Amino acid sequence: LNKEYREKFSLLNYYTYYKDKWRIGMEEKKIVVAGHVSLDITPKFNMRTKVSSIGSVIKAGKLVNVGQVAIAPGGCVTNTGLALKKFGVDVKLIAKVGNDEFAEILYEKYRKQGVEPNFIVSEEDNTSYTIVLALNGCDRAFLHDSAANDSFCEKDIDYEVVRNSDYFHFGYPTLMKEFFREDKDELRKMFKKVKNFGLITSLDVTTIDPDSEQADIDWNQRLSEVLPYVDFFVPSVEELCFMLDKNKYYEIQNRASDDVCMHLSLSEDIVPMAEKVITLGCKGVLIKCGAAGMYLMTSDSVRMKELDGKISIEEWSNKRIFQNSYTPDRILSGTGAGDTSIAAFIYGICKGMTPEDTLRIAAGTGASCITEYDTLSGLLPISILKNKIQNGWKEQNFIHK
């Protein structure tokens, strides 16, 4: 009798587990991507060889011959949102622009991707733009005007659209004045409202200029206020290190003569930061480590239980996974690689994939993105990406354990 009971109980667990996985994966999820948008202007550098740093090319008094310029939508809303659209996901975009020519270019570019933008239009602000300096062999640099992003605030969010969705992703509050000002509480208020609707939430940030007012903010304190309402925090290792420990950030910068991500220790640099973030309240942290790959850490099943019915708690609890990057077919530009990899990460969550498979398609998406100058042209359909991985796509082992 005991054996028969155990067998029935085991079959019941098996049925329940796979029934839930089927339901999570087959339901069509509605995703909202909100936050920062800009027009990216990227000149093509005709370099014969790889360079170690941008400073070795761009110097005072020197003329640098460049090629055709690429003009494309940029920012989190574009890069993550349109990548999700390309993956076949139902996605709504929330952002703020000016009433100007740059906005018209953005609208035209979005429509070509099959998206009708319904952005908030400011008559007082211009549309944000970014000049992207992307040279083969070194990390990118940016010249950026936040513009209308600085007046975007929590009240600009269309909460009716959010309420009728399943997943909410917000990007780049570190570049949006109303969201990073210390006398404001916009970021926490927004995520608390969204979380009360029962959505899965994620937060992305971007590089902080050490000479900006954002650099003086106590980001440990700010994150401790916001992350309890964030399920997945998805920063890069440089961004996170600057926020948590500036001294450590400068120490790593000094240690690395070129790409910081190539000089990281998993045990000494990445894992301690991930552990710190988990204590600040989020359920999981995905740290993007550039050419090295990405690291996922999730909390225990007690905290993850809040996402029951939305993801597999058994599969996603207590995870510690470093996913190596994949060898790209070629390297033209790193623009949007992190954002599009996050789009694949969100896709995997919403489709009921395991964390291991989710990280594989996220890393594969990043490696595909950098094969073109713009963000979207190099992206592969998820089915083709999976086949490429299953057929032995070579991983790159750059991380120091």
What is the predicted function of each stretch?
Residues 182-189, 215-222:
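Charged helix-capping and loop-helix junction motifs
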Residues 113-116, 216-242, 315:
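Structural recognition of alpha->loop->beta junctions
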Residues 175-185, 213, 244, 252:
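Glycine/threonine-rich flexible loop motifs
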Residues 1-25:
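Short, Lys/Arg-enriched N-terminal segments with co-localized hydrophobic residues
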Residues 109-125:
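A glycine-rich helix N-cap at a beta->alpha junction
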Residues 21-94, 101-112, 313-317, 324, ...:
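Glycine-rich phosphate/adenosyl-contacting loop at the front of the ribokinase-like
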Residues 122, 132-178:
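Conserved phosphate-binding/catalytic loop of the ribokinase/pfkB sugar-kinase fold
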